[in-house]
Amino acid sequence: QPANAKANIQQQLSELEKNSGGRLGVALIDTADNSQILYRGDERFPMCSTSKVMAVSALLKQSETDKNLLAKRMEIKQSDLVNYNPIAEKHLDTGMTLAEFSAATIQYSDNTAMNKILEHLGGPAKVTEFARTIGDKTFRLDRTEPTLNTAIPGDKRDTTSPQAMAISLQNLTLGKALAEPQRAQLVEWMKGNTTGGASIRAGLPTTWVVGDKTGSGDYGTTNDIAVIWPANHAPLVLVTYFTQPQQNAEARKDVLAAAAKIVTAGL
């Protein structure tokens, strides 16, 4: 995009942020030319449930060399259930496979499913280790669900930057970070997400195909990371992170939708 269009986008994002009363982070990668639009692109934001993509990707990476891994069944105890378990709570008798935990984690943001994946991997630090192996030096996962969502301003735990997450998401969903079957599986799970309708998707034309993962936490933290297939354009990768100064602030999915609309308006 020409310089004046880019400046205009920055100005619109700045306006949006000012009117929202929070802190907004945006990173768009246009894979047509790998150009980036960044707004607070290198600042740290709490990831909340957007971190689930990296956890599931770490599992998918393991499954490249262990073809039975995703069929492995793990039990679910009553004591495993946390604050949000829409799928896991229905399977206390049978348990679930790692594939089922992965789908529940990405498509329903089931927190018990995420914790089961973390348990299998050996803890949050293993997800950080995986991020390093795909070239992401910024991502850090420190805690399990639901404490990873405390989103305390200035706390570096469970944070990344919009730019780092966008690059990793591009590598995982469109690049070579995962082998082809695993990459395709991640994309399929993200395209089937049920939680993103009011976030990035709401700011895009309805004909565009989207795969995304939302996140939310304290301080009105409202997040979405997406791979986008526009009607007549190369894929886009978009990260929108938003957090607020008051611990009990309301979620603002509308801010994410507005940011998505601003950065894709010229396409």
Swiss-Prot record:
Enzyme Commission (EC) number: 3.5.2.6
A GO BP entry: beta-lactam antibiotic catabolic process
Pfam families: Beta-lactamase2 (PF13354)
Activity regulation info: Inhibited by clavulanic acid, sulbactam and tazobactam.
Gene Ontology terms for molecular function: beta-lactamase activity
Annotated active site: 49
Reaction it catalyzes: a beta-lactam + H2O = a substituted beta-amino acid
UniProt keyword annotation of Protein biosynthesis present: no
Annotated positions binding substrate: 213-215
Domain of life of the organism encoding this protein: Bacteria
Record keywords: Antibiotic resistance, Hydrolase
Miscellaneous comment text of the record: The class A beta-lactamase family has a specific amino-acid numbering system, sometimes called Ambler or ABL numbering and often misspelt as Amber. A multiple sequence alignment was used to derive a consensus sequence and then the consensus was numbered taking into account insertions and deletions. This allows use of identical numbers, e.g. for active site residues, despite differences in protein length. UniProt always uses natural numbering of residues, hence there appear to be differences in numbering between this entry and some papers.
Function: Hydrolyzes broad-spectrum beta-lactam antibiotics. Active against cephalosporins.
Family: Belongs to the class-A beta-lactamase family.
PANTHER family attached to this UniProt entry: BETA-LACTAMASE, BETA-LACTAMASE-TYPE TRANSPEPTIDASE FOLD CONTAINING PROTEIN
The protein's name: Beta-lactamase
Organism: Serratia fonticola
